[in-house]
Amino acid sequence: MTKQFAVIGNPIEQSRSPELHHAFAEKTGVDLNYQKRLAPLDGFESSMRSFFAEGGSGMNVTVPFKEQAFALCDVLTERAQIAKAVNTLWMENGKLHGDNTDGQGLVAAIQALEWNLENTTILILGAGGATRGVIYPLVQAGAQKIVIANRTLARAEQLVDDLKTAVPQAQLQAISLNDLEGDFDIVINATSTSLSGDALQLPEKLQFKYAYEMAYGKPSSFIDQAKQRNVPYAEGFGMLVGQAIEAFYIWNGVRPQLKDFL
C-alpha cells in the first residue's frame, strides 16, 4: 500500500520536500506519495490531525508551525526537546511523536563537504529557532566551542542560558553582532538577512576557514563576503536534503546517501 506523507506550512508553494522524498523513494524502492499542505495560520492542529486521521504515515512541518507542532506532541526525541521545535511528525501506538532533523541535516551537509567538525570553534550568526535547532547536533558531532552572535545581545544570552542546562558538555558564548572578531573554523549564517536582503557586514578582524549559509537559492551578502576572502563556502541546499533524509529514515527505516542528491 502506498504510504502517504506531507509537508505542512504557510506559505508552502516554495517547498522542495515533495521532489526530494519522491527522489529518495525512487532510489530506495519505498512506495510513497508526498504532498504539500497549506494550513491556515490558525488551522495547523486541525489540518495536521485530519491528515493522520485519514491514514497519513508522516508529516514534515515548516514555517510558521514548528513550535506549535512541538507543543502538541505526546512523545519527543531528545534533540526536539532541546530545539523546542519539531519538523518531523508520525503516529505510533496512538501517540503523536515529534523530532527535529534540522541540526542533523546541517551536520550531514558539513560532513559531506569534508569540513572537519571535531574540536572546532564555530560562530553562528543569529539566535532564532534555526540556531537553537542545530546546537546539540553540532556538539554531538564534535564542535568544541560555539559562539552565538545576535543583533540583540540579550536574546543570544537567553539562548545560551537555556542551552547550558540542556547541553552541559558544550562551551557556549553569546556576543553582539557588533563585536564580531577572532578566529573561527566555521561561520554559519542563521540570520534572515539573506532572505530580507539586509546586508550583514563581516569585519576584517573576524577570521574564518569556512562559511555556511543556511538559506539557499537567493543572493546572499554573507556568501559574497566569503567569496571576496577566498573562503570555501556552501549554501543551505545540502542542509535541506540532509534533514529530509533523516525524516525519510525515521519514517521508512532506510537512509538514502546524501551525496546522491547534491
Curated annotation (Swiss-Prot):
GO terms for molecular function: NADP binding; shikimate 3-dehydrogenase (NADP+) activity. GO terms for cellular component: cytosol. Homodimer. The keyword Cell cycle does not apply. Belongs to the shikimate dehydrogenase family. InterPro entries: Aminoacid_DH-like_N_sf, NAD(P)-bd_dom_sf, SDH_C, Shikimate_DH, Shikimate_DH-bd_N, Shikimate_DH_fam, Shikm_DH/Glu-tRNA_Rdtase. One of its GO terms (biological process) is shikimate metabolic process. Keywords: Amino-acid biosynthesis, Aromatic amino acid biosynthesis, NADP, Oxidoreductase. Pfam families: SDH_C (PF18317), Shikimate_DH (PF01488), Shikimate_dh_N (PF08501). NADP(+) binds at E78, G126, A127, G128, G129, A130, N150, R151, T152, L153, A154, R155, M214, G236. It catalyses: shikimate + NADP(+) = 3-dehydroshikimate + NADPH + H(+). The active site is at K66 (proton acceptor). It is an enzyme of class 1 (oxidoreductase). Involved in the biosynthesis of the chorismate, which leads to the biosynthesis of aromatic amino acids. Catalyzes the reversible NADPH linked reduction of 3-dehydroshikimate (DHSA) to yield shikimate (SA). Pathway: Metabolic intermediate biosynthesis; chorismate biosynthesis; chorismate from D-erythrose 4-phosphate and phosphoenolpyruvate: step 4/7. Shikimate binds at S15, R16, S17, T62, N87, D102, Y216. Its EC number is 1.1.1.25. HAMAP family: Shikimate_DH_AroE. Coiled coil: none annotated. This is Shikimate dehydrogenase (NADP(+)). It comes from Acinetobacter baumannii (strain AYE).
